[in-house]
């Protein structure tokens, strides 16, 4: 690969004493695993650039599964993700690192990812709707072609007030059962449009994407969720101390 590509670091781990093994999400090649030799060294010019949420231009070489980084240049400063939105960004990166196939193009998803990061960077609290839209875009890119607008049993258009139960690999079937797997027709229409005007439709979207992504993620828990839980616990504890001091 001789040309430059836009990319983001989505995962990194030490490799030997001075190098890094990186997963990049690239504009044209999707997820690519690349070895950056000497990137951990004190004098490496790449040390500050190879960070999450920094838009990059990169070049690499190699024919095997693990490529070798040749050049990397920041396009701009890192997108400023702090506080709770930082953990949302880490969640996006972990999703991509775990579910995308190596070397498969997801060019549309690359721009969905960039857009979501920009929304996160402009927010003080996590914009849940942006995360749900990204998850739905990811499912579409993975080939998850689910019809939200028709009953999988009858083929008829969904009705706003009726209840439909989700069945994996089949779709939504009209049902009188109301449980974790049930959605109203109105909620399904919101999922189809990727628009969530109410708290109820937003909660339904989160419930659905959790279920739909589970087969891709397997049984291994997401580290980003655990990190966010620890952050939230510490934040609550700090608030309690401040209240007691007043």
Swiss-Prot record:
Q: Name one GO cellular component term.
A: bacterial nucleoid
Q: Name one GO biological process term.
A: DNA recombination
Name the domain of life. Answer: Bacteria
* Native source species: Proteus mirabilis (strain HI4320)
What is the purpose of this protein?
Involved in DNA repair and RecF pathway recombination.
Q: Which protein, by its recorded name, is this?
A: DNA repair protein RecO
The family database entries (Gene3D superfamilies) matched by this protein are listed as: Nucleic acid-binding proteins, Recombination protein O, C-terminal domain
| Pfam families, alphabetized | RecO_C (PF02565), RecO_N (PF11967)
Family to which this protein belongs:
Belongs to the RecO family.
Would the keyword DNA repair turn up in this protein's UniProt record?
Answer: yes
What are the record keywords, sorted? DNA damage, DNA recombination, DNA repair
């Amino acid at each position: 690969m001789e040309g430059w590509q836009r990319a983001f670091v989505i995962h990194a781990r030490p490799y030997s004493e001075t190098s890094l093994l990186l997963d990049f999400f690239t504009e044209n090649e999707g997820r690519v695993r690349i070895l950056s030799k000497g990137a951990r060294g004190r004098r490496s010019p790449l040390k500050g650039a190879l960070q999450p949420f920094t838009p990059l231009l990169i070049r690499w070489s190699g024919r095997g599964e693990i490529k070798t980084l040749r050049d990397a240049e920041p396009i701009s400063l890192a997108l400023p993700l702090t506080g709770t939105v930082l953990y949302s960004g880490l969640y996006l990166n972990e999703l991509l690192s775990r579910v995308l196939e190596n070397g498969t193009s997801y060019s549309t998803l690359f721009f969905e990812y960039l857009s979501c990061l920009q929304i996160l960077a402009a927010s003080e609290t996590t914009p849940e709707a942006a995360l749900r839209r990204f998850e739905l875009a990811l499912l579409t890119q993975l080939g998850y072609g689910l019809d939200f607008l028709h009953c999988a049993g009858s083929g008829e258009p969904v009705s706003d007030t009726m209840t439909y139960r989700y069945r994996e690999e089949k779709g939504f079937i009209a049902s009188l059962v109301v449980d974790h797997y049930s959605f109203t027709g109105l909620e399904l229409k919101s999922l189809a449009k990727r628009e969530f005007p109410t708290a109820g439709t937003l909660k339904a979207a989160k419930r659905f994407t959790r279920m739909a992504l589970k087969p891709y993620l397997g049984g291994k828990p997401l580290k980003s969720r655990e990190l966010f839980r620890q952050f939230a616990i510490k934040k609550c504890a700090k608030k309690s101390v401040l209240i007691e001091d007043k």
